């Protein structure tokens, strides 16, 4: 079966799959960040340290586990909500923390595949940016994501969607790297 046939079959499967719509805060666990300033992050940063601390946009610091209180270290695959400035979602599946004005979600529900939710939220970033743009400094609050309803198809459907989107993401990265190398 060629890629176009697979894509048509996937679209058909999604359109006919039973879907429940539930608020994000009802189906995922929201976690808090750590109290840290940009200056402290810069001071603590060590190249190749094992723990990533996320801040707004593309800003992060690599630190040692001892640098952050254990209660603020998240070890589950998660969606990090970058809630100020550039509003976006990031998926991360290694131990991490983030600044306390941000939050993250992970799943303890065996019927929810966190990476599926991440891919869905990526398609909704403009919605959240529009909410955030009403402020002088763009930002959203936890109720904005907690109360946001997401479609929840069967776990099997979620896994198929993620498998296909992971392939597309990988192909896109390969294509970008190839184009950059040629230029």
PLM features: what roles do these ranges have?
Residues 1-4, 16-20, 146-183:
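Amphipathic alpha-helical segments
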Residues 29, 135-136:
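Primarily mature extracellular domains of secreted and cell-surface proteins
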């Amino acid at each position: 079966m060629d890629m176009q046939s697979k894509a048509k079959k996937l679209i058909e499967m999604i359109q006919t799959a039973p879907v429940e719509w539930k608020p994000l805060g009802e189906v995922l666990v929201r976690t808090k960040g750590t109290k840290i300033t940009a200056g402290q992050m810069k001071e603590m940063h060590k190249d190749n340290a094992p723990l990533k601390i996320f801040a707004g946009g593309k800003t992060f610091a690599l630190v040692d586990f001892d640098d952050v209180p254990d209660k603020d270290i998240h070890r589950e695959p998660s969606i990090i909500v970058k809630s100020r400035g550039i509003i976006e979602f990031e998926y991360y599946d290694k131990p991490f923390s983030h600044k306390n004005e941000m939050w993250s979600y992970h799943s303890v529900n065996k019927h929810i595949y966190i990476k599926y939710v991440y891919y869905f939220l990526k398609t909704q970033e403009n919605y959240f940016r529009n909410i955030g743009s009403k402020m002088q400094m763009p930002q959203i609050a936890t109720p904005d994501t907690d109360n946001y309803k997401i479609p929840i198809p069967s776990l099997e459907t979620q896994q198929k969607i993620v498998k296909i989107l992971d392939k597309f993401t990988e192909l896109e990265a390969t294509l970008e790297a190839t184009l950059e190398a040629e230029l």
